[in-house]
């Protein structure tokens, strides 16, 4: 069995153009590739935010949205969310429900303090969990906390440097803020 994880590369028109090994793709010259971001809420309406593991290649130890990931070859963004989010936050797949795409055309490019680039076509999703007892994957998540969405939005606006650049940019979109603050 081949355990090499691939990411799907994109051309300048946003179409798949090949694959690259995930562990090798994030450099100072990262090619455009497909990913997703997801914001997860519990039954109280609180939002899960996670602190990226210190071992992450990009933005280690930074607070960010609930989960992010890359599409595998042949996979839709929705399928990637259903596969990857439960793995990262530590729940069974059947406990992740109500997956909805809020920002289908979101993309961004950001450079971290070491010059490593993230450049992604990254649809943004919301989802809910039916059980908020989580066991996060240590290679992905250092810690996590449930917060009121309005408090998170205020914190990101007040101190954007404390959060991932993609989350800061995503929360500038009214459609996402509305989806996170309404039931």
Swiss-Prot record:
Disulfide bonds: none
One cellular-component annotation, GO: cytoplasm
Pathway(s) of this molecule: Isoprenoid biosynthesis; dimethylallyl diphosphate biosynthesis; dimethylallyl diphosphate from isopentenyl diphosphate: step 1/1
An annotated Gene Ontology molecular function: isopentenyl-diphosphate delta-isomerase activity
All residue ranges annotated as the Nudix hydrolase domain in the record: 31-169
Protein keywords: Cytoplasm, Isomerase, Isoprene biosynthesis, Magnesium, Manganese, Metal-binding
Family: Belongs to the IPP isomerase type 1 family.
PANTHER family: ISOPENTENYL-DIPHOSPHATE DELTA-ISOMERASE
Protein name as it appears in the record: Isopentenyl-diphosphate Delta-isomerase
Lineage, top ranks: Bacteria, Bacillati, Actinomycetota, Actinomycetes, Mycobacteriales
């Amino acid at each position: 069995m081949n355990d090499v994880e691939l990411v799907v590369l994109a051309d300048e028109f946003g179409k798949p153009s090949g694959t690259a090994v995930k562990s090798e793709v994030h450099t100072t010259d990262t090619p455009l590739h497909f990913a997703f971001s997801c914001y997860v809420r519990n039954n109280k309406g609180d939002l899960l935010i996670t602190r990226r593991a210190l071992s992450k290649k990009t933005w280690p130890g930074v607070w960010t949205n609930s989960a992010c990931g890359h599409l595998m070859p042949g996979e839709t963004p929705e399928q990637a969310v259903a596969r990857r989010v439960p793995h990262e936050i530590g729940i069974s797949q059947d406990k992740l429900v109500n997956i909805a795409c809020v920002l289908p055309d979101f993309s961004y490019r950001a450079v971290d303090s070491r010059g490593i680039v993230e450049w992604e076509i990254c649809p943004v999703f919301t989802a809910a969990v039916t059980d908020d007892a989580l066991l996060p994957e240590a290679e992905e998540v250092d810690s996590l906390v449930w917060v009121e969405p309005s408090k998170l939005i205020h914190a990101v606006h007040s101190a954007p440097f404390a959060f991932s650049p993609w989350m800061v940019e995503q929360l500038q979109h009214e459609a996402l803020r509305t989806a996170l603050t309404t039931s």
